[in-house]
Curated annotation (Swiss-Prot):
This is Putative aconitate hydratase, mitochondrial. It comes from Emericella nidulans (strain FGSC A4 / ATCC 38163 / CBS 112.46 / NRRL 194 / M139) (Aspergillus nidulans). Its EC number is 4.2.1.-. Keywords: Iron, Iron-sulfur, Lyase, Metal-binding, Mitochondrion, Transit peptide. It comes from the Eukaryota. The gene is acoB. [4Fe-4S] cluster binds at residues 399, 462, 465. GO terms for molecular function: 4 iron, 4 sulfur cluster binding; aconitate hydratase activity; metal ion binding.
Length: 796
């Protein structure tokens, strides 16, 4: 009877998708000879030839890491990038400004809006490189895919219509709502060994599980690639992570990165590429490697990647890319000197070794992804910190952990519990990563197994992971509560808008097991659960399949993109009265002098993530409308003077919200700066966290340190990121102080060469001078002088 019910639900879902197909696939063009190539095959011949040129520039005896090989073989001009300011190529890492030409760009629906609005202003007929848009961030997770998907499509129709029409006009592959999460779709369709791509999402490095250099960027950076302008990256240092042994028992690939995050912290990877190597690599599946690379974003790494592995071949073949598998295997057969492996004598700036054979499961959180605790010590840690000993929901899936392997390992545990007569004591939610994964799990009865346990299958989208979760368990806002997820990020308020929801990150199999106890102190390795019959039940370690034995099921064809064909006859409409979309007005250029009379809008205490600066969740609806979304600027920031959140005070002591005070000052023509602590802008590639302050009159962000992506995004939008030369000076500057820059204008005019100071006038009239540092390159200086990178591109 149960299978019949599940079958009826699946049939109803297929009927629903068929009904939605016209609005999902409306009028997409078909391929013609004039179409720019949308081949999933990387340009291997060109890349290999470029690597040969790099070896000529640096000398054939120079040993290169895998990351260096792929990056340098994508340089626009190898000699210029590698030999300028690098002691004739001897000091490239951390010093060279690499001018790169990526192979591909991927964008998700929330960030694609602003990226496209910027691209459209450049006036080109099509994108210069293959590009794709994936509608995943704006789908709500609440009661299940059958209800949530059509409601989300209807509620976001204007935005989806805009994205689809722009895709048709400019020749971009459009993956409609419900097709899947960007990173899972990229892994299944576009990622390949040796590829270099950009994505407008911080978890783009997920593609590194298949041997690609994939870097998360803001929309302005993506536009560089889309218009065929070289994209600039400070040459990263390389962190080598050597994997030895093989995972045992309950340990999963997720535990490798959870453990590593605890070692490195949220900023320990800043300025580094994490390059995995060693004999343990070949014990991991492709999707397991992708999970590890995905969460490299949580330690601030530029990207993460794995070398070519024999396990890449069956995955590529299973995802209809046998030609890519054959080509990559042929290149890799040349050994360590090939494009797809590090040279034997390559040196790493830092090296960490992890023994997989002794690694135990880890749980990270709450409120930060680097608070890592081994499972064996977690119960003790819960009690020590007075965290809740029960939890409300377990959520598995997402871009980090929705592979066939992940789901079948979780399914194995559900089957064990079903046989023992157990039901989950916490709500269980399942998010398939793509239509291909969902359809395959449906065919193989995995989804019916989850449903038999009362699990709710959400749409193939981000949902709760990005804050699109409408909880139905009536937890009051501000109330301490716990959830367990297999997601990648757990900042306060991220999932449900409640800053007191404690999200503990773990593998999907561990999350699944814990839901049956409903207890944060349960250890499935050692603890048992009493069954309805009174017997004691203990889980066996989970097992699963890397790939489906029957192959992947494609699923509903309505979710497949058509071949990209630019069509200039397609009109891309943006209504002047829209509350969701607004064309961009150019930012004003930098004045012909240093900045004067900047007021300190706010002094931030502690962690300030991109979620803090530009919240997601219900605000995602305004991603294409800069004036409207600017109303959430810094609403999660804590006032250093008072400890209040989103409470700012003007010179008269009057209280305001931060965006309200910023808007008032903008209306008065007053420009301002923000003062912050470490790793400002930690988290996502969300360029709105740079656009919004700029729109409201922000000129400078002064911090102890910055997250890499956010620092770049600020420069692209004409905001100057400065750091304290002496971090103790953070205590010398306060809200409403007045600041003038000294030496900044000359530094910008000199292409980033020069020293900068800030002259600060206190409320008392006292003046102090604070020396500051910057990382401005020549190109970045030109962006700021012009007002933004887009202003520079538009003139070209």
């Amino acid at each position: 009877m149960l299978r019949q019910i599940v079958s009826q639900r699946s049939a109803a879902r297929r009927q629903l998708i068929d009904q939605l197909a016209p609005c999902l696939r409306r009028g997409l063009a078909t391929a013609t000879d004039s179409t720019p190539t949308s081949s999933r095959m990387p340009p291997y011949s060109k890349i290999v030839q470029n690597l040969e040129q790099v070896r000529k520039v640096l000398g054939s005896s120079r040993a290169l890491t895998l990351a260096e090989k792929i990056l340098y073989s994508h340089l626009d001009n190898a000699e210029e990038s590698l030999l300028t300011g690098t002691n004739n190529g001897r000091d490239i890492r951390g010093k060279a400004d690499l001018k790169l030409k990526p192979d591909r760009v991927a964008m998700q629906d929330a960030s694609a809006q602003m990226a496209l609005l910027q691209f459209m202003s450049c006036g080109l007929p099509s994108t210069a490189v293959p590009a794709s848009i994936h509608c995943d961030h704006m789908i709500v997770g609440e009661r299940g895919a059958d209800t949530d998907l059509p409601a989300s499509i209807q509620g976001n129709k204007e935005v989806f219509d805009f994205l689809e029409s722009a895709s048709k006009r400019y020749g971009i592959e459009f993956w409609p709502p419900g097709a899947g999460i960007i990173h899972q779709s990229v892994l299944e369709n576009y990622s390949a060994p040796g590829l270099m791509m950009l994505g407008t999402d911080s978890h783009t490095p997920n593609a590194g599980g298949l041997g690609a250099i994939a870097i998360g960027v803001g929309g302005a950076d993506a536009v560089d690639a889309l218009v065929d302008a070289p994209w600039e990256l400070k040459a990263p240092r390389i962190l080598g992570v050597r994997l030895e042994g093989k995972l045992q028992g309950w340990a999963a690939p997720k535990d490798i990165i959870l453990h590593l995050a605890g070692k490195l912290t949220v900023r320990g990877g800043t300025g580094f590429v994490i390059e995995y190597h060693g004999p343990g690599v070949e014990t991991l599946s492709t999707t397991g490697m992708a999970t590890i690379c995905n969460m490299g974003a949580e330690v601030g790494a530029t990207t993460s990647l794995f070398p070519f592995s024999p396990n890449h071949v069956p995955y590529l073949k299973a995802t209809n890319r046998a030609d890519v598998a054959e080509a990559a295997a042929k290149i890799a057969s040349a050994g360590s000197s090939s494009l797809l492996r590090a040279d034997t004598s390559a040196e790493y700036d830092e090296l960490i070794t992890i023994d997989l054979s002794t690694l135990e499961p880890h749980i990270n959180g709450p409120f930060t992804p680097d608070l890592s605790v081994p499972l064996s010590r977690f119960a003790e840690t819960v009690r020590k910190n007075n965290w809740p000993e029960t939890f409300n929901a377990g959520l598995i899936g997402s871009c980090t952990n929705s592979s066939y392997e992940d789901m079948t390992r979780a399914e194995h545990l559900v089957k064990q519990a079903n046989a023992a007569g157990l039901k989950p004591k916490a709500d269980l939610f399942i998010t398939p990563g793509s239509e291909q994964i969902r359809a395959t799990l449906d065919r193989d009865q995995t989804l019916s197994t989850f449903s038999s346990a009362g699990g709710t299958v959400l749409a193939n989208a981000c949902g709760p992971c990005i804050g699109q979760w409408k909880r139905t368990d009536d937890v009051p806002k501000g109330t301490d509560n716990a959830i367990f997820t297999s997601y990648n990020r757990n900042f306060p308020g991220r999932n449900d808008g409640n800053r007191r929801t404690m999200n503990f990150l773990a593998s999907p199999e561990l999350v699944t097991a814990l839901t049956y106890a409903g207890s944060t102190t349960f250890n499935p390795v050692t603890d048992s659960i009493t069954t309805p019959s009174g017997s004691e039940f203990r889980f066996e370690p989970p097992t699963g399949q890397d790939l489906p034995s029957k192959g992947f099921e494609a699923g509903n064809p309505a979710f497949q993109p058509s071949a990209p064909v630019p069509d200039s006859s397609v009109e891309v409409k943006v209504s002047p009265t829209s509350t969701r979309l607004a064309l961009l007005e150019p930012f004003a250029p930098f004045p012909n002098s240093d900045l004067q009379n900047l007021s300190v809008l706010y002094k931030v205490k502690g962690q300030c993530t991109t979620d803090t600066i530009s919240a997601a969740g219900p605000w995602l609806k305004y991603k294409g409308h800069l004036p409207n979304i600017s109303a959430n600027t810094l609403i999660g920031a804590v006032n250093a003077a008072t400890g209040e959140t989103n409470v700012a005070y003007d010179e008269a002591g009057k209280q305001h919200t931060i965006p309200d005070l910023a808007a008032q000052w903008k209306a008065q023509g007053r420009e301002w700066l923000v003062v912050a602590e470490e790793n400002y802008g930690e988290g996502s590639a969300r360029e709105h966290a740079a656009l919004q302050p700029r729109y409201l009159g922000g000129r400078v962000i002064l911090a102890k340190s910055f997250a890499r992506i956010h620092e770049t995004n600020l420069k692209k939008q004409g905001v100057v990121p400065l750091t304290f030369a002496d971090k103790a000076d953070y205590d010398r500057i306060d809200a409403c102080d007045v600041v003038a820059t000294e030496g900044l204008y000359e530094t910008l005019k000199n292409g980033g060469k020069g020293e900068v100071k800030l002259r600060v006038t206190k409320k008392s009239g006292e003046e102090i001078v604070i020396p500051v540092k910057h990382t401005l390159s020549a190109d970045q200086s030109s962006f700021i002088l012009a007002g933004s990178a887009l202003n520079v591109l538009s003139k070209r």
